[in-house]
Amino acid sequence: MGIKPSYIKNLGEELIVKHRDRFSGDFEENKHAVAEVAVIDSKTVRNRVAGYISRKINTRKR
């Protein structure tokens, strides 16, 4: 999908630090968790942040 914008990375990293136990490697679960812990009006931005978090967690597991 290409390089993520810095605001997606910054928000994703911040959410991982603050709410590490709420996120997993599953995108669908992360979508709901991001919606609960952050106020993001745009569905597109929410999904991109959830995808970034999922990818970060999955690469850390390897």
From Swiss-Prot:
Superkingdom: Archaea
Molecular function terms from GO: structural constituent of ribosome
Pfam families tied to this protein: Ribosomal_S17e
SUPFAM superfamilies in the record: Rps17e-like
InterPro entries: Ribosomal_eS17 (IPR001210), Ribosomal_eS17_sf (IPR036401)
GO BP term, example: translation
GO cellular component entries: ribonucleoprotein complex; ribosome
Similarity remark: Belongs to the eukaryotic ribosomal protein eS17 family.
Protein name, as recorded: Small ribosomal subunit protein eS17
Gene that this sequence comes from: rps17e
